[in-house]
Amino acid sequence: MKYAHVGLNVTNLEKSIEFYSKLFGAEPVKVKPDYAKFLLESPGLNFTLNLRDEVNGNQVGHFGIQVESTEEVVAHKNRLAENGILSQYDEINTTCCYALQDKFWIHDPDGNEWEFFYTKTTVEENSTHPPTCCVNEPNVEKAECCSPTASSNKDTSNCCS
């Protein structure tokens, strides 16, 4: 297998190209008026953006990029922040999908969630939290707390874990 392929419907191709260029640290290899293609070698990914008039909700649970260390999670978070893409929420030593992980989450221009995560070890027990870590489910409390429009003086220390 050479490449995994994801075709993502988007409502604003220009904003999406800008976002994903920053996310992947690469420019698309092909751009048309209604289409853009990123071809990444590591990880092997053929990722296309397909312009649509509307996208109704998050049609996927979430996307993720697994890295090899907590330091790499932090490096990606810092790299994206330097490019204007801020973490929506961070999870350190969180139990998710029967694994102990460090991660952070961001959203693309259409609201699709991406996580950068490092799996420290497997665990026998799954999280006691609602299953939003592995499957995206609407969480109004988390969204209000962790959204970029949330008040900067609001205490968010416990709402995003």
Swiss-Prot record:
The keyword Protein biosynthesis does not apply. This is Trivalent organoarsenical cleaving enzyme. Inhibited in vitro by reagents that chemically modify histidine residues (diethylpyrocarbonate (DEPC)), aspartate or glutamate residues (1-ethyl-3-(3-(dimethylamino)propyl) carbodiimide (EDC)), or cysteine residues (N-ethylmaleimide (NEM) or iodoacetamide (IAA)). Pfam families: Glyoxalase (PF00903). The thiolates of the vicinal cysteine pair (Cys96-Cys97) directly coordinate the arsenic atom of the organoarsenical substrate. Its EC number is 1.13.11.-. InterPro entries: Cadmium-induced_rsp, Glyas_Bleomycin-R_OHBP_Dase, Glyas_Fos-R_dOase_dom, VOC, YqcK/CadI-like. It catalyses: methylarsonous acid + AH2 + O2 = arsenite + methanol + A + H(+); roxarsone (III) + AH2 + O2 = 4-hydroxy-3-nitrocyclohexa-2,5-dien-1-one + arsenite + A + H(+); nitarsone (III) + AH2 + O2 = 4-nitrocyclohexa-2,5-dien-1-one + arsenite + A + H(+); 4-aminophenylarsonous acid + AH2 + O2 = 4-aminocyclohexa-2,5-dien-1-one + arsenite + A. Nonheme iron-dependent dioxygenase that can break carbon-arsenic bonds, playing a role in the detoxification of environmental organoarsenical compounds. Catalyzes the oxygen-dependent demethylation of highly toxic methylarsonous acid (MAs(III)) to arsenite, which can then be exported out of the cell. Can also cleave the C-As bond in several trivalent aromatic arsenicals, including roxarsone (III), nitarsone (III) and (4-aminophenyl)arsonous acid. It comes from Bacillus sp. (strain MD1). Its cofactor is Fe(2+). Keywords: Detoxification, Dioxygenase, Iron, Metal-binding, Oxidoreductase. GO terms for molecular function: methyltransferase activity. Organoarsenicals are used as herbicides, pesticides, antimicrobial growth promoters, and chemical warfare agents. Arsenic is the most widespread environmental toxin and is classified as a Group 1 human carcinogen. Fe(2+) binds at residues 5, 62, 115.
